[in-house]
């Protein structure tokens, strides 16, 4: 009888102190893709114990961002503030088992210990004054002082793990002082809550930013003290800005939802974020389904990745070009309305087919579509004077006359234009530019026959007649 492998369970555990930034979104994406690849479970946990900085608005921003990117969790969101009784229960068990202890040293006393260690050329740390040991007499308890609870970290040997991204990592336990796991008011600390959550939620694989590497040996030691099964850990390098510095607001948008506002497609964002620190051969473009199919931790990069706005624009432009015109129209329509345009004024799907090859974002598409979706404004006098010369007006009148009984397809319009050019000995710009100026009030548009077809025969003839 063969045993069934345990279900892989990953988690994303943001702190709701602001929006979901790009680094967090990429970490969530890797955890989501890993779980999906293995038919596992992706858990969302909100680490909201920082009461001063955590807000409901930030929680909602995280949920909105994940929903936009299509990374819905299988379980959660779970909130740490709703699990306080469980944390206190485990702390009580650890105190009972002797793997944690009360420490009455004041913050000033601990700082003095750290300074003394620095003076001796040692790593600054708590010196274990209140750590119980066989045969050791502890100091008298200071009157009226509430203790912290510290974890009794091993004092010899090393704590290591085979990191899914970086390979073997090890810390000498002498470098790790006894971590505070509960504050004087009894509230548990971040590193402790994370451990209990991962244990209770059965997390098997932790993918997170490499700023957490120093937390990992402490968390492993607490898990061992609890008799828990250890998850596998992987630490992903940070994202750098185009200048090689850590990505920050000065490099532009770092809030995921700002990219939605700027007209980036979630499909493109998922593709770009995944490629930023993970690879599948030379494939630059892949669907969400392909990401899930191909994802593995062996191809996560050990070195930092560089944010490249031009590359993101290239990826987004690809997805815009590939998208079905009707679907694209549905996504662009609200952006046209926000600009005061009427998406129903034109066959918007046809307009998308005409405009999308020139667009890098949905915002650019919406702006271009106003050509067809806003009330007609005659060309400015200066433009009309330059391009609507007497000769041009004669050619336009000829075109209008021929158009009266003609079919109004792009092909038929192109044939009309060619006939006028041939009969009058003109070159294309000598008719195409005046047509643009007369019909849409500007000199630059996509192919003039396509523009006229979309504007519609009646509107074109009315505008030419008004010259």
UniProtKB/Swiss-Prot annotation:
The keyword Cytoplasm is assigned to this record: yes
Chain intervals for the UniProt region annotation (Disordered): 124-156
Enzyme class, UniProt record, top EC level: ligase
InterPro entries cross-referenced by the UniProt entry: aa-tRNA-synth_I_cd-bd, aa-tRNA-synth_I_codon-bd_sub2, aa-tRNA-synth_I_CS, aa_tRNA-synth_I_cd-bd_sf, Glu-tRNA-ligase_bac/mito, Glu/Gln-tRNA-synth, Glu/Gln-tRNA-synth_Ib_cat-dom, GluQ/Sye
Catalytic activity: tRNA(Glu) + L-glutamate + ATP = L-glutamyl-tRNA(Glu) + AMP + diphosphate
PROSITE patterns: AA_TRNA_LIGASE_I
Primary localisation category: cytoplasm
EC number: 6.1.1.17
Annotated motif 'KMSKS' region, positions: 246-250
GO MF, one annotated term: zinc ion binding
Ligand binding (ATP): 249
Residue span of motif 'HIGH' region: 14-24
Protein location: Cytoplasm
Bias-annotated ranges (Basic and acidic residues): 124-134
Record-linked Pfam families: Anticodon_2, tRNA-synt_1c
One BP term from GO: glutamyl-tRNA aminoacylation
Keyword Aminoacyl-tRNA synthetase attached: yes
Keyword list, A-Z: Aminoacyl-tRNA synthetase, ATP-binding, Cytoplasm, Ligase, Nucleotide-binding, Protein biosynthesis
GO cellular component, one term: cytosol
Family according to the record: Belongs to the class-I aminoacyl-tRNA synthetase family. Glutamate--tRNA ligase type 1 subfamily.
Cited HAMAP family: Glu_tRNA_synth_type1
Role played: Catalyzes the attachment of glutamate to tRNA(Glu) in a two-step reaction: glutamate is first activated by ATP to form Glu-AMP and then transferred to the acceptor end of tRNA(Glu).
Subunit annotation: Monomer.
UniProt-recorded name of the protein: Glutamate--tRNA ligase
Lineage: Bacteria, Pseudomonadati, Pseudomonadota, Betaproteobacteria, Burkholderiales
